[in-house]
Regions:
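Hydrophobic structural packing positions in well-ordered secondary structure
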Residues: 31, 82, 109-110, 160
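Conserved active-site segments centered on acidic
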Residues: 3, 17-104, 169-181
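Phosphate-binding/catalytic loops
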Residues: 107, 113-181
Length: 181
């Protein structure tokens, strides 16, 4: 595997990561609370990767920049949108990202500008160019719509699916793999 895919077997501070997963392309989606946008992106991306027969080549997760929702499940609005698409999200509990996540992931994807600033604060910067804003993969500089304030999970779904599709294409191209659409 070429490109940004993890090739090291060094032990990171991340829990639950096996040796095999260290050879995967590792993506972490990040929002403020890890109950609405970032878990939606996590499960949409897992679904896209599965449908592309690439599940064995990816490790996908999500986290928060804040401590406000730690331990809480996916928001009911996000669960409902995922369920409408036949995507399960059981077992997810919000967690806060750590500095170690920077070393453990190839792509850290923030949902908005505020998230990006907080991610860089937590990680101490972005010397390896791993931090991206989600909508940049959909050809936009805007933020992913935040349903926490609007209640509009449909707008968030549209942003997340466009962003995830663009991100998957970007990753496949960067790692020298042909898209399996």
């Amino acid at each position: 595997m070429s490109g940004k895919a993890h090739k090291t077997t060094q032990n990171s501070a991340l829990q639950g990561i096996s040796e095999q997963e260290n050879f995967m392309i590792r993506v972490l989606f990040i929002c403020h609370g890890n109950i609405c946008r970032s878990p939606m992106a996590e499960y949409v991306m897992k679904d896209l990767v599965k449908k592309s027969n690439l599940s064995d080549q990816f490790h996908i997760s999500s986290a928060a920049t804040s401590t406000e929702e730690i331990g809480n499940p996916v928001h009911r609005g996000t669960r409902a949108k995922l369920a409408q698409a036949g995507i399960a999200c059981e077992g997810h509990h919000a967690r806060q990202m750590t500095r170690a996540d920077y070393d453990g992931y190839d792509y850290l994807i923030g949902m908005d500008e505020w998230n990006i600033r907080n991610i860089k604060r937590i990680t101490g910067g972005d010397p390896e160019g791993k931090i991206f804003k989600m909508m940049s993969f959909a050809g936009s500089s805007r933020d992913v719509a935040d349903p926490w304030y609007t209640g509009d999970f449909e707008a968030t779904w549209k942003d997340v699916t466009e962003g995830c599709q663009g991100l998957l294409q970007y990753i496949l191209e960067e790692n020298g793999k042909a898209s399996k659409k």
